[in-house]
Structure formats: structure tokens, C-alpha cells
């Protein structure tokens, strides 16, 4: 009997796989949209886009993606106090579906702003609460929890990997067509971006239907009702206790990591903005006579994560890996990000550094190997910094401030995406060689600074590893 109970405990609850599928299809929807957004913003109306200049498009992209990391703070609070996690997930998914559908149905600036607004609001309800449901499936201290989150994030990356492949195929091949410019008589390619947004909307609808049909069966009462009552009273009693000196120093360390993480992700998020525009114009994407859709390169990072995450996890758990401190790991992540920019600079200098838009200039293309090497190195940097950061914030936070400080940590991505949009807006103005060199040098210096702060930060962490 005891053996059977132990075997059951080793298995994950079926609710985890429901959340896995729900999250996977939602990320399919989001990354399908994200993979073509910069192209949609910058292509001409005749080409199926909205004809924004690259600077304006970069700012729109940066602030829109950044706000998707800010609204979960509000959506999580509303779910905890009023809606409950299940209703918040369904409401958020429904709002995001309408956001994607608006992008499909309205080829206009108004449609863009309305669609992005709905996506930002919907994501605020969906994102924090789908993750919270994973944790709610397990009792405190359950050793299966780390494995559960690994499975959940594998679903996220699977959705992020598959989505750009489909949307890129739809926009660049299946629904692309040649049209004649009525003013010049020139034949231009019109891309089917609206159908990419439709695919993203359908993906979100699939997520909603799966969750609606199976939530009661596999989640029971989990997340049905908002938290409150006794828990609020208990939290209020705990929060009256003053912070100790150790807790204050640990919180200071969290804000140091927060500061450096902003710089990392501001450089990392160029993948969706300046890298995408550079890839579309100046990278040789033809392989064996087939031109790879630009959106497909947004699948490279999640593919590398799926392949490399187990390798990094194994290394961190090895005897040598356990001797490496958190500041050293995060500093290494920043340095790897900077090194990745060396490869982008290789692409820039292979074609002479120019980013002019005349046909003779755009005919000079750089090898796609530079881009793949950039994404590989950046993914390695991400695996050094991102999961390590989430783990250490959890460990360093005083229990009464754990939720607040995790929310603060997530807002690093908001500031980083917004800053990344501003940075990307200068690529066209100053040239990629200058912007990429500055980013590379700056984040490498930040990484070295983090390593130099290693001993001091370790002392302030008071034994937390």
C-alpha cells in the first residue's frame, strides 16, 4: 500500500498537463504575433504593413512588449482579491483573442493600437495566474514542484518555437502575393500579416477551449475563488513585524540584480526589433533555393532553450557548478550577451556596415551564420541569468514581501523592453556598427562589474546560495 502511494506521489497531477497545454497555446498566440509585429509595423501599406519608420516602430514594439510585463502586477492582484485565478485566466485569454482578432480584421493604425491594448490587458490577467495554478497543484515543500515548473516552461518554449514557423509560412509564402504599385508600376511583394494574426487568434482560442472544457475535471476547486479572509488577516499580522538587518541587506541584493537584469534584457530584446529588421533586409536567408521567412528566426532562441536548458541544469547541479555563485553566473550571462554582439558586428562588417535602403545596397547580404551564432550565445547568457535570477529572488525575499519582490523583479523586463525599443530606434539613425558596439561594450563591463561585486554581494546574502 505504501509503495503504491509513493508511486502516485512521484507522478504529476493531470492538472499540470492541462496547464501545460493552456500555456503552450497562449504562448503560441503571443509569439506568433510578436514574431511578425516589427515587420507589420515597418512594411508599406501595399506590402501589407503600416508604413511606420523604423524608429517609431521600435518604440511601439518596445513599449507594447514591455507593458505585457507590467500589467501582470495588476492582474495578479485583481485575481487574488476579486476574480480568482481560473476566471482571470479565462478573462485574460478572451481579451487576448479579441486583441489578435482586431489585428487581423483592422489593417489600420487604430486597429494596431486597439489590438495591442487588448493584448496588454489580457496578458495581465492571464500570465501571472496560469503560473500560479502550477504552484497550487502541489503542497508546500513538494519536491516535484521544480520538475513541474520545468515541464510548464517547456510548454511555453514549445509554443514560442512553433508559432513563428507557422506565422512566417503564412505571411511570406501561403498568403503572400505580387502586386503592382499603381504609382510606379513596380511589382512588389504583399505579405499576409493579417493571416499571421488570425493564426495567433486561433491559437488563443484553442487555449481557451482546452481550459474551459477540462479545468473542472483536472483542477477541481483550485483557483476558483479569490484568496482572502484568514489568509489576509494572517498576512497582515506577519507584515507588522519589522525587517531585520539581514532581510534588508538581502532586499538590497535583489535590487542590485534587478538593476543589472534591466541592462541584460534591453540588449537581449533586440532580437524582436532591430535584429528582425536587419535580418529582413541584410541577411542572406536563401538556403537551397528556399528563402527562409524572417519570422522563423524568432524560433531559434526557444529551440536553443529546449536543447540547452537540460545541459545547463545538469551543469549547475554538478559538483563544480554548485561552487559557482549567483553573481558569477549572472555576470557570465551579461558577458555572453556582449560576446553575442560580436557576431552581429561580424554580419555588419561583412557587408561594409551600411544600412542604406537603395537596391544596390540591399543587394549585399551577410551570412545567416552570424545571426544563428548571436542567438546561440545570447541563449547561453539567458540561461545563466534568467532562471538563476528567479530562483535567487525567491530565496532572498522575506516571506511577507515574496510576492511584491517577485513582481518587482518581473518589472525589470518592462523597463528593459521599453529601453530596448528606445535603443533599437537609434540603429537606423546612428548605424548598427555604433549601436551594437556600444551595447556589447556596456553589457560586458556590467558583467565584469557583477563579478567584481561577487564577495560583497555574497556577504549581504547571508548564506543564501
Ranges and model annotations:
Residues 58-79, 161, 299-312:
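Central cavity-lining transmembrane alpha-helices of secondary-active solute carriers
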